[in-house]
């Protein structure tokens, strides 16, 4: 009986988690109409795997006046999406400080579902920015304060958008800019070369990726003076994604005159989300101060 009740509760939680996702496109680009194998599991954290149909969940901070909006890309090595502690939980925090949030359920790269799997997540991120600006009036969003945020591989996706916003991969409405106004990256994968997270690279590009593609997705190589301002957080003892990823990205940003701030923890490892339990210091508070300093919020 207890096992039955536990199963029902788990299913109920999962239904609540997924009921809010809306279609990202009218017609999905770069898509093979194969059986949808999306699945989910709760094992300490909520994970979504095999996403082939992208979606979004919009969390409103109120409709009294236009507010900033952050698009959140959960991490998961381009294999799964940690959609709760790196997604919906973060969205609720942003709402508490007067920022709308959109959690992006981006596609997991798959040869079964995409003719060109390596660009599918970037297409979804570009579309998400476009969508927010399309609905700016209805959703009470300030279209000049639309940011992108990502954790781990989601940070790679977010930074890919930040440096490749001018390489349009979608055909929805090219009159609307897909350039984010700011970026927030949590223990991000940045480079696909020296400091690469091999799993993320293989899942996105495949085992036989070319040097040109690895360079394209080594985002520190594509920073320029028009790259959006950035806030990053990383722990020195991260054994999954070395902190050097954040170091080289911040160096590239500052070398190009782009405002960037890196919050460094001595410990914390990888995947701590909003709260690093090994430290009394709050990177979330530092991020809020950074948002205020850059006049994104008051």
Regions found by a protein language model. Give the residues of each.
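N-terminal cap/lid segment of alpha/beta-hydrolase-fold proteins
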Residues: 20-64
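Mobile cap/lid helix-loop segments that gate and shape the active-site cleft of serine hydrolases
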Residues: 43, 188-222
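Short beta-strand element of the alpha/beta-hydrolase
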Residues: 67-75
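Catalytic nucleophile-loop/oxyanion-hole region of alpha/beta-hydrolase
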Residues: 82-83, 89, 106-143, 276-282
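Short amphipathic alpha-helix adjacent to the substrate-entry channel of hydrolases
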Residues: 84-102
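Primarily recognizes the serine-hydrolase "nucleophile elbow" in alpha/beta-hydrolase
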Residues: 127-197, 214
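Short beta-strand/loop motif that positions the catalytic acidic residue
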Residues: 231-234, 238
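C-terminal catalytic histidine-bearing segment of alpha/beta-hydrolase fold enzymes
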Residues: 247-298
């Amino acid at each position: 009986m207890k096992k039955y009740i536990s199963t029902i509760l788990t299913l109920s939680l999962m239904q609540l988690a997924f009921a809010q996702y809306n279609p990202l496109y009218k017609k999905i680009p770069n898509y093979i109409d194969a059986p949808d194998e999306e699945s989910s599991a709760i094992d300490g954290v909520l994970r979504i795997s095999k996403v082939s149909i992208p979606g979004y969940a919009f969390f409103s901070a109120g409709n009294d006046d236009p507010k900033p909006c952050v698009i959140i890309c959960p991490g998961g090595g381009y294999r799964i999406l940690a959609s709760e502690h790196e997604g919906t939980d973060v969205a609720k925090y942003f709402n508490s400080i007067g920022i709308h949030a959109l959690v992006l359920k981006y596609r997991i790269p798959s040869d079964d579902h995409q003719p060109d799997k390596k660009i599918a997540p970037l297409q979804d991120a570009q579309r998400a920015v476009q969508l927010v600006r399309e609905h700016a009036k209805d959703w009470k969003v300030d279209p000049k304060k639309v940011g992108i945020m990502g954790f781990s591989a989601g940070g790679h996706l977010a930074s890919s958008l930040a440096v490749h916003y001018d390489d349009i991969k979608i055909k929805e409405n090219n009159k609307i800019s897909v350039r984010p106004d700011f970026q927030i990256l949590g223990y991000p994968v940045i480079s696909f070369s020296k400091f690469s997270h091999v799993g993320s690279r293989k899942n996105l590009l495949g085992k036989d990726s070319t040097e040109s593609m690895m360079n394209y997705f080594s985002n520190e190589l594509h920073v320029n003076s028009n790259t959006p301002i950035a806030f990053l957080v990383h722990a020195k003892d991260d054994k999954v994604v070395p902190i050097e990823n954040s170091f080289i990205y911040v160096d590239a940003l500052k070398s190009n005159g782009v405002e960037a701030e890196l919050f460094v923890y001595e410990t914390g490892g990888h995947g701590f989300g909003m709260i690093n339990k090994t430290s009394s210091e709050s990177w979330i508070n530092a991020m809020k101060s950074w948002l205020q300093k850059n006049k994104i919020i008051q």
